[in-house]
């Protein structure tokens, strides 16, 4: 994959529950604490190194932000770091929360 692709929350949900991809949430700590996908890794400048140590470049990565805009830049960055397959989730956490309100965790 030379460029990231955009996927909707239904596709992301399917990949996550099939175990074929990991989900990273790039929102600020306060927004993340107020609600996030339970399986999400909170990816920040401080946690990037740990994420890269724990996930090989052949790991399929899905990036979630607030509305699906900031995730595009982060997805491109992860591709530039060497990840083979990266997706930006259209609609971000707002769309996830609308479609899957029972699949939201709270706290850090």
From Swiss-Prot:
It comes from the Bacteria. Pfam families: Rhodanese. One of its GO terms (molecular function) is thiosulfate-cyanide sulfurtransferase activity. InterPro entries: GlpE_sulfurtransferase (IPR050229), Rhodanese-like_dom (IPR001763), Rhodanese-like_dom_sf (IPR036873), Thiosulf_sulfurTrfase (IPR023695). GO terms for cellular component: cytoplasm. One of its GO terms (biological process) is glycerol metabolic process. SUPFAM superfamilies: Rhodanese/Cell cycle control phosphatase. It is found in: Cytoplasm. The keyword Zinc does not apply. The keyword Nucleotide-binding does not apply. It catalyses: thiosulfate + hydrogen cyanide = thiocyanate + sulfite + 2 H(+); thiosulfate + [thioredoxin]-dithiol = [thioredoxin]-disulfide + hydrogen sulfide + sulfite + 2 H(+). Keywords: Cytoplasm, Transferase. Residues 17-105 form the Rhodanese domain. Its EC number is 2.8.1.1. CDD domains: GlpE_ST. The active site is at residue 65. Transferase that catalyzes the transfer of sulfur from thiosulfate to thiophilic acceptors such as cyanide or dithiols. May function in a CysM-independent thiosulfate assimilation pathway by catalyzing the conversion of thiosulfate to sulfite, which can then be used for L-cysteine biosynthesis. Belongs to the GlpE family. PANTHER family: FAD-DEPENDENT OXIDOREDUCTASE, THIOSULFATE SULFURTRANSFERASE GLPE. This is Thiosulfate sulfurtransferase GlpE. It comes from Citrobacter koseri (strain ATCC BAA-895 / CDC 4225-83 / SGSC4696). The lineage of its organism: Bacteria, Pseudomonadati, Pseudomonadota, Gammaproteobacteria, Enterobacterales.
């Amino acid at each position: 994959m030379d460029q990231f692709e955009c996927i909707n929350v239904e596709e992301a949900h399917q990949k996550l529950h099939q175990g074929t991809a990991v989900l990273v949430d790039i929102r600020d700590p306060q927004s993340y604490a107020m609600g996030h996908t339970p399986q999400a890794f909170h990816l920040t400048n401080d946690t990037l190194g740990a994420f890269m140590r724990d996930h090989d470049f052949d790991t399929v990565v899905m990036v979630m932000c607030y509305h699906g805009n900031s995730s595009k830049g982060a997805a491109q960055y992860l591709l530039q770091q060497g990840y083979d397959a990266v997706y930006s989730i259209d609609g971000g956490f707002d769309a996830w929360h609308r479609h899957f309100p029972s699949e939201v965790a709270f706290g850090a």
